């Protein structure tokens, strides 16, 4: 295999939250001179730190992590934005002679980057407000009938009472002049010319849940509540006008409910652990149904981490 061919092979390290993928990616990156593409839709926000298990400043100093600390809460950024930008950066890194790792567990980001996405226009606040007024004035059946006339195939997939997708479908038509059905046929494959080896970290469900619970306790000991208080004070009164899901992140939303006196502290912590476990289940379902993953046992100690690092490095370098 020629060096130019090797540069076309990259490794994606996936796994449910708390499975150890970040530590493995960091270990591999140090060995093969790689930069990391973080496929984490929450670590990209500067304001979210402890609750997102963001890499330490020392880790970020040693290895370049892309899409970490790059946006502020409220900055619009879609899975399509991520896939386009990540694809461009991956090519630039490979062109420079370095290796690339993808590491993360955000399903929408991974779906767009690894499986491709429809090139839909970004949300338009003014157009969406116009449709919202029309919805309130004439009702969802009126909008649904309009969509049925314009894009019957898309309308057939919708329940007219689920107004978010209904409004988005009409917004796309009015912004682009094309139906959603037409747009989805123009599927973009960001990494079609690059060989991506997808590896997933697997561990027994009871052990995963134990790690999730223990990590939640560690986050609290590291100041998660104090971080939530700062976010609550600065952003919570404006949640309705901030167009991001960042503030609905598990670990923060439960503490916001506590700070808003809608629940007690003990219940909030219980819910953080429960919701994180539920999130891990959804991630595993996605990995198994949507991606072709080579599953590996998650390392439980430094020796196993070292052995797995060596094995993964060989997948990329061929040595």
Curated annotation (Swiss-Prot):
Keywords: ATP-binding, Magnesium, Nucleotide-binding, Transferase, tRNA processing. Signal peptide: none annotated. GO terms for molecular function: ATP binding; tRNA dimethylallyltransferase activity. Residues 40-43, 164-168 are annotated as: Interaction with substrate tRNA. Its EC number is 2.5.1.75. Its cofactor is Mg(2+). ATP binds at residues 15-22. SUPFAM superfamilies: P-loop containing nucleoside triphosphate hydrolases. One of its GO terms (biological process) is tRNA modification. Substrate binds at residues 17-22. It is an enzyme of class 2 (transferase). Catalyzes the transfer of a dimethylallyl group onto the adenine at position 37 in tRNAs that read codons beginning with uridine, leading to the formation of N6-(dimethylallyl)adenosine (i(6)A). PANTHER family: TRNA DIMETHYLALLYLTRANSFERASE (PTHR11088:SF60). Monomer. This is tRNA dimethylallyltransferase. It comes from Chlorobium phaeobacteroides (strain DSM 266 / SMG 266 / 2430). The gene is miaA.
